[in-house]
C-alpha cells in the first residue's frame, strides 16, 4: 500500500474529528473527536516516516500519544467535574465551573 492511501485516510479521520468538535455539544463526544484528530495526525506522521525511511515521524507520533494520554487524564477529570456539578456533560456547562 502506498503512502497516499494512508494520507487520504488520515485526512478523512481528521475531518470527521473536526466536524465532531464543531457540531457536537456533549463534552465526551467532543473529547473523543479530539482524540480522533490526534490519531489521524499520528497516522500521517508514521506514513510519512515510513515513506522516507527514518524514525523521526514515529518518534513524534510516540510523543503525541504520550501527550494524548496526559490529555485524557486531565480532560476526563474536567468532564467528571462538570457532570458532578451540573448533572450534564454539555460543553455549554463548562463556563459555569467558575462559580
UniProtKB/Swiss-Prot annotation:
Record's Gene3D superfamilies? 1.10.287.3510
GO-annotated biological processes: ATP synthesis coupled electron transport
- Could you list this entry's UniProt keywords, alphabetically sorted: Cell membrane, Membrane, NAD, Quinone, Translocase, Transmembrane, Transmembrane helix, Transport
Q: What is its EC number?
A: 7.1.1.-
Q: Which residues cross the membrane?
A: 3-23, 28-48, 59-79
How does this protein sit in the membrane?
Multi-pass membrane protein
Q: Where in the cell is it found?
A: Cell membrane
Name the chemical reaction catalysed here: a quinone + NADH + 5 H(+)(in) = a quinol + NAD(+) + 4 H(+)(out)
Superkingdom of the organism of origin: Bacteria
Example of a GO cellular component annotation carried by this entry = NADH dehydrogenase complex
Family label: Belongs to the complex I subunit 4L family.
Q: Mind telling me which PANTHER family this protein's record contains? A: NADH DEHYDROGENASE SUBUNIT 4L-RELATED, NADH-UBIQUINONE OXIDOREDUCTASE SUBUNIT ND4L
Subunit notes for this chain? NDH-1 is composed of 14 different subunits. Subunits NuoA, H, J, K, L, M, N constitute the membrane sector of the complex.
Function of the protein: NDH-1 shuttles electrons from NADH, via FMN and iron-sulfur (Fe-S) centers, to quinones in the respiratory chain. The immediate electron acceptor for the enzyme in this species is believed to be a menaquinone. Couples the redox reaction to proton translocation (for every two electrons transferred, four hydrogen ions are translocated across the cytoplasmic membrane), and thus conserves the redox energy in a proton gradient.
Protein name, per record: NADH-quinone oxidoreductase subunit K
Q: Which organism is it from?
A: Nocardioides sp. (strain ATCC BAA-499 / JS614)
Amino acid at each position: 500500500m502506498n503512502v497516499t492511501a494512508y494520507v487520504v485516510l488520515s485526512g478523512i479521520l481528521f475531518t470527521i474529528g473536526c466536524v465532531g468538535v464543531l457540531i457536537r455539544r456533549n463534552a465526551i463526544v467532543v473529547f473523543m473527536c479530539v482524540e480522533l484528530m490526534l490519531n489521524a495526525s499520528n497516522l500521517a506522521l508514521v506514513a510519512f516516516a515510513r515513506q522516507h525511511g527514518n524514525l523521526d515521524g514515529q518518534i513524534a507520533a510516540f510523543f503525541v500519544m504520550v501527550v494524548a494520554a496526559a490529555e485524557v487524564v486531565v480532560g476526563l477529570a474536567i468532564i467528571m467535574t462538570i457532570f458532578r456539578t451540573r448533572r450534564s456533560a454539555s460543553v455549554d456547562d463548562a463556563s459555569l465551573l467558575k462559580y
